[in-house]
Amino acid sequence: MAREKFERNKPHVNIGTIGHVDHGKTTLTAAITNVLAKKGQAQVQNYADIDGAPEERERGITINTAHVEYETDTRHYAHVDCPGHADYVKNMITGAAQMDGAILVCAATDGPMAQTKEHILLAKQVGVPALVVALNKCDMVDDEELIELVEMEIRELLSSYDFPGDDIPVVQVSGLKAIEGEAEWEAKIDELMAAVDANIPEPVREVDKPFLMAVEDVFSITGRGTVATGRIERGIVKVGEEIEIVGIKDTRKSTVTGVEMFRKLLDEGMAGDNVGLLLRGIQKEDIERGMVLVKPGSITPHTKFEGEVYVLKKEEGGRHTPFFAGYRPQFYIRTTDVTGQITAFTDRDGGNVEMVMPGDNIKMTGELICPVAIEQGMRFAIREGGRTIGAGVVTKIIE
């Protein structure tokens, strides 16, 4: 029991390993657990445990993801590793595994490859705030100058995607030798984790952000007024506070006259709570599913945005045929479907494409028929007749 209590005293951070196939992401993940297990800060996970990750479904998309957990002296980590490249793309776009930071694994024997670049771009697009580089397989390169060249190449690559390439720590490691118990390489894993502790910022707790709750349901209580229910996404709301109702119709203000959870009255509701909020002077018809209740002035509704989208394959339940610019699906945003149009799209690197095939990964411009509270970094699904055909993340608000 003592262990449980100990764990909660440390801040919790979500991280993951990213990088090119066969550069050693999974081996490095196993090495971290092996080295930390010797200090009692992790359970040993071997390569096969992590590589045989079960399939998970997120927004109707099948993703293979392995989750391991471990501690350092100052933090508790949840660490995600994906076996396949397609799994990373899906994972990062759907936000199935939200990352507060990532360890970019690059083999010193190869240097940066196609997926190294793609994962850095994805990390930038979906808002992974910080990276640390693990230069892996350094035991296989005798020439120190060669290692320095690879490091320079990685730093330039990071800078080209607007990460601070000159400042990001690059640690020389060998996942395999660390697992085999060679002391000098075990020490390098400690050095890597110290870099992660120091360079991946602690996430702002949801409860410290401005209040937001997406409306799931609305009903009237005779003699008391209108109640909106939903799960508080972030922040805190107190009885007597003013809020704004944003999206679909014109923004309007109201005052919260009651907060109720499990039929009990509360003084306040906080991030993660499923609550009913009693709103003063609001009729049932003024408010509907898909609107959000927010701290006044903290969010404005928008109709045009850019997004990074993964389009499901036919085997994943997606479309069987391609679509073209002007395609009009529904965008499922927070709690509701909003009709919109995909007005333009390019491939990942901004190259022109005529049409979008099932299984593609694109950048797109979307326009909604009514303004909704969308924000940069927010996830959405693209649906057609109630079934998901794509998943995306908002990369930029246009208007």
From Swiss-Prot:
Residues 60-64 are annotated as: G2. GTP binds at residues 19-26, 81-85, 136-139. Residues 10-204 form the tr-type G domain. Keywords: Cytoplasm, Elongation factor, GTP-binding, Hydrolase, Magnesium, Metal-binding, Nucleotide-binding, Protein biosynthesis. Its EC number is 3.6.5.3. Mg(2+) binds at T26. GO terms for molecular function: GTP binding; GTPase activity; translation elongation factor activity. It is found in: Cytoplasm. Residues 136-139 are annotated as: G4. Residues 174-176 are annotated as: G5. One of its GO terms (cellular component) is cytosol. It catalyses: GTP + H2O = GDP + phosphate + H(+). Its main location: cytoplasm. It comes from the Bacteria. Residues 81-84 are annotated as: G3. Residues 19-26 are annotated as: G1. NCBIfam families: EF-Tu (TIGR00485), PRK00049.1 (NF000766), PRK12735.1 (NF009372), PRK12736.1 (NF009373), small_GTP (TIGR00231). Monomer. Belongs to the TRAFAC class translation factor GTPase superfamily. Classic translation factor GTPase family. EF-Tu/EF-1A subfamily. GTP hydrolase that promotes the GTP-dependent binding of aminoacyl-tRNA to the A-site of ribosomes during protein biosynthesis. This is Elongation factor Tu. It comes from Synechococcus sp. (strain RCC307). The gene is tuf.
